[in-house]
């Protein structure tokens, strides 16, 4: 049997590569064999901002938890109940684990599947309180409900040539798209994306795909702002002050139709407050820059601590708030 290694969270600020058990077709929560699953050999895996929350000690993650929920891999072993996925297939793995059979999955709310985590709705690989599934920052990993959860690339050779792009399909791009979509972006929309990291840039590009007329991207880091500019977005340097003033200079009005929070609760302040953490800053600012009856897409809300947002500040505008589904 092949050896397996994974990246384990040990304590705040400390991770280490460990030898771990080779995966089995096994559900760790119900302790039963799962013939609907497969075992993957990992081709690529990414570091998510959510992983960093754990590593920084911002969650109750236990020592020894194997990290990683952004996975692309090659199918090594197939359970006998799997119909459409074959050994040797190259596949993308959505970060949330879903059964495809429960009411929530049938209503397309796969992020809160009722069957993959006995403790609460919703499950994911390598994350605290999300069902006990081993993470994908490893050499091999188990994926349950393979016919439902895996996206097979039709041409293996072409997939390998584009693997650095396709690796974003497991989390980064769909998360950004979900933020733009739930914010109601459509033809002619004006949009503000708070955060120019990978997910924020994916949200900005998704807003363009959805037909936005103007997309603003706010961040503190010049390289991120330049990247946003490179594909047609208007950069907003929040280290220079409030985004609303800069948006008005470019748009002629101080408000947009839709906004997305792609930063989350480890946000920093604007202008002179940019050197320290201010959890409520981003969400409160997108409420300020969005017009009355506009929509907000909040990608990073699930783990937010008390003080993340002052929702009273948005009450007068009657926003449609769309947290992750």
Regions found by a protein language model. Name each.
Residues 1-6, 28-31, 35-36, 299-325:
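C-terminal hydrophobic helical "lid"/dimerization subdomain
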Residues 27-46, 55-106, 111, 133-134, ...:
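Glycine-rich beta-strand-centered segment in the early N-terminal region that forms part
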Residues 70, 87-90, 104, 140, ...:
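Residue-level marker of beta-strand positions
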Residues 99-192:
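NAD(P)H dinucleotide-binding glycine-rich loop of Rossmann-like/cofactor-binding domains
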Residues 183-185, 210, 226, 231-298:
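Glycine-rich cofactor phosphate-binding loops and adjacent beta1-alpha1 units
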């Amino acid at each position: 049997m092949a050896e397996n290694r994974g990246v384990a969270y040990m304590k705040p600020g400390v991770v280490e590569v460990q030898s771990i058990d080779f995966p089995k077709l096994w559900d760790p929560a119900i302790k039963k064999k799962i013939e609907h699953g497969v075992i993957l050999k990992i081709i690529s895996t990414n570091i998510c901002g959510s992983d960093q929350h754990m590593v920084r000690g911002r969650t109750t993650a236990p020592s020894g938890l194997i990290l990683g929920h952004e996975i692309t891999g090659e199918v090594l072993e197939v359970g006998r109940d799997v119909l459409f996925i074959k050994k040797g297939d190259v596949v993308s793995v959505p970060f949330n684990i879903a059964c495809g059979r429960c009411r929530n999955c049938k209503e397309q709310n796969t992020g809160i599947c009722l069957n993959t985590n006995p403790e609460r709705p919703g499950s994911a690989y390598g994350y605290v309180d999300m069902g006990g599934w081993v993470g994908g920052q490893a050499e091999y990993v188990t994926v349950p409900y393979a016919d439902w959860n895996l996206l097979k690339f039709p041409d293996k050779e072409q997939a390998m040539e584009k693997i650095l792009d396709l690796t974003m399909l497991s989390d980064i791009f769909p998360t950004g798209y979900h933020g733009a979509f739930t914010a109601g972006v459509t033809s002619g929309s004006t949009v503000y994306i708070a955060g120019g990291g990978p997910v924020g840039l994916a949200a900005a590009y998704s807003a363009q795909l959805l037909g936005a007329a103007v997309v603003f991207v706010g961040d503190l880091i010049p390289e991120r702002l330049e990247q946003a500019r490179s594909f047609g977005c208007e950069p907003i340097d929040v280290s220079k002050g409030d985004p609303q003033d800069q948006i008005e200079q470019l748009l002629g009005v101080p408000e947009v139709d839709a906004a997305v929070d792609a930063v989350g609760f480890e946000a920093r302040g604007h202008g002179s407050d940019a050197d320290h953490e201010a959890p409520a800053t981003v969400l409160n600012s997108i409420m300020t820059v969005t017009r009355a009856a506009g929509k907000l897409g909040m990608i990073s809300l699930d783990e937010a601590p008390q003080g993340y947002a002052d929702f009273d500040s948005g009450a007068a505008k009657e926003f449609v708030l769309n947290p992750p589904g």
